[in-house]
Amino acid sequence: MDMLKQAGYIEADGTPHQPKDWYELAEMAQKIKQVTGKPGFVLPTAANSGGWLFTQIAWGFGVNFMEKKDGKWTATFNTNECVEALQYVKDLKWKYDCLPSDIIVDGTAYGKIFATGGAAMTFGSGGGTPKMVINYDMDKEDLGMVAIPAGPKGRYALMGGMLICISNKTNQDQQRAIFKWLNLTDISETEKESYKTSQQTFIDKGIQVGPRILSSFTDSSPRQAFYDEWREQNVNVNEANFKLYNDSLNDPSITLRAEEPRCAQDLYGILDGCLQQVLQDKNADCRAILEEANKNFQEQYLNDQEN
């Protein structure tokens, strides 16, 4: 928030400026670096994290990474849309000059760079903010969030999730009961107390209470209503810091998408290589890079997918 303030990107109501699209974000990042001397934006490029978050940018440019037809999967990202998306990332380095000098940035490093004042903006989520404070002693008041910017073909946000393990010793009746329980919109008093206890631990560690977390439950469900009421009663930061992000969770113009349906981690690794090439070489050919990447993904991974 401090670097945005220095560059004039805090609005009169205290909210951080919302970039309408990825190109405005690049312009903001460029100005922030010019004013503060610090990189305006950092994005991961390694350990599959770069490819993972690049899909979110690319969807906004109209990219479809794979298609299934007649039971076979085909790689489909050697397109003009993906060339444009990769060119955008290339321009962050060579046109806008707003990235850190180190271009090999993994999933841990980009959060550390941001949280320790090495860059003004990065990707984030409501559930990912506590580690910024816990791991790197970031001032919780210096952390703000806005909605995902739009691409030429729309606004897309990558959904997260969690793993729930069910014992292989359970029978079918037990499994049905478990899935029914997972979908209950009610919340018991025991669950409420457990939630309050766990969240109080965060508060005691100085974690901010402010950003909402995207939920599979509707706002009107008893469970979500409890979560929202608790958050509102325990907010410990300037709510303007997170207002635009919180509002965006109910914004119908943002399309939520799950990760790619086949060989996602392998795709991310290949896309990491694409990002690194365009950030290392000012003369890199985005189309040639994507043609090779598309071919490799098809031959090395999708050809083995039977359904």
Where are these regions (language model features)?
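C-terminal lobe and pocket-closing loops
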Residues: G128-D139, K153-L158, I164-G269
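Bilobed periplasmic-binding protein-like "clamshell/Venus-flytrap" ligand-binding domains
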Residues: Q34-A46, S188-T197, E299-N307
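Periplasmic solute-binding protein
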Residues: M1-G14, A26, L43-G71, L86-V89, ...
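Alpha-to-beta junction loops
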Residues: G37-P39, T116-S125, E141
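Short, solvent-exposed loop/beta-turn-alpha elements that line the ligand-binding surface or hinge
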Residues: G14-Q18, V63-E84, N135-D137, A147-Y156
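Glycine-centered hinge/linker elements that transmit conformational signals in sensory
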Residues: E24-K31, G71-I103, I148
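Short helix-initiation/N-cap motifs at beta->coil->alpha
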Residues: P19-E24, S101-T116
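Short helix-loop capping/hinge motifs at secondary-structure junctions, enriched
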Residues: M3-A12, V35, W94-Y96, D139, ...
